[in-house]
Every structure is written in structure tokens, then in C-alpha cells.
Amino acid sequence: MMFPVRCFTCGAPIGHLWEEFKKRVEAGEDPGKVLDDLGVKRYCCRRMFLSHIEISYEILNFPKVS
């Protein structure tokens, strides 16, 4: 699914940080360090990044039901 624009718990805007987080983690950086560098301090917001799973492409493989 798409990454949320805001944290589900506190409502802080976090969506603008997703691409930078994803790029740096894929490059091999520690996710916790990346979140610290991006200024994500609340554990509820950090959870949003660490628990997000991209499944959009898997869902697209299912046929439409009429």
C-alpha cells in the first residue's frame, strides 16, 4: 500500500520523509540512524516507517471480480 501521509497515532506529517528513508535504507544504512537523521523522534512515527510493507504490486496481480 501507499505510505501514509500522517502518523496514525499522533497525526504528525511523515509522508514527505518516506522516499528519503527508503533510498537510504536500500543503500545499506541503519534504519534507526536514518530516522534519527530525518528528525523522527516519536516511537509511534518510527513504527510507521519500520513496519510499512509495499504490497501494491502484489495486489495488482489479482483479477477483478465483477
Swiss-Prot record:
Catalytic activity from the UniProt record: RNA(n) + a ribonucleoside 5'-triphosphate = RNA(n+1) + diphosphate
Localisation: Cytoplasm
Top EC class of this enzyme: transferase
The keyword Zinc appears for this protein: yes
Binding site for Zn(2+): C7, C10, C44, C45
Coiled coil start-end: none
Entry-linked Pfam families: RNA_pol_N
BP GO terms, sorted: DNA-templated transcription
Cofactor (UniProt): Zn(2+)
Record EC number: 2.7.7.6
Keywords assigned: Cytoplasm, DNA-directed RNA polymerase, Metal-binding, Nucleotidyltransferase, Transcription, Transferase, Zinc
InterPro entries noted in UniProt: RNA_pol_su_RPB10 (IPR023580), RNA_pol_suN_Zn-BS (IPR020789), RPABC5/Rpb10 (IPR000268)
An MF annotation (GO) of this entry: zinc ion binding
Domain of life where this protein originates: Archaea
A GO cellular-component term linked to this record: DNA-directed RNA polymerase complex
Cofactor binding, note field: Binds 1 zinc ion.
Record's keyword annotation contains Repeat: no
Record-linked NCBIfam families: PRK04016.1
Subunit field text: Part of the RNA polymerase complex.
Entry-linked PANTHER family: DNA-DIRECTED RNA POLYMERASES I, II, AND III SUBUNIT RPABC5, DNA-DIRECTED RNA POLYMERASES I, II, AND III SUBUNIT RPABC5 FAMILY MEMBER
Family: Belongs to the archaeal Rpo10/eukaryotic RPB10 RNA polymerase subunit family.
Record's function text: DNA-dependent RNA polymerase (RNAP) catalyzes the transcription of DNA into RNA using the four ribonucleoside triphosphates as substrates.
Name recorded for this polypeptide: DNA-directed RNA polymerase subunit Rpo10
Source species of the chain: Staphylothermus marinus (strain ATCC 43588 / DSM 3639 / JCM 9404 / F1)
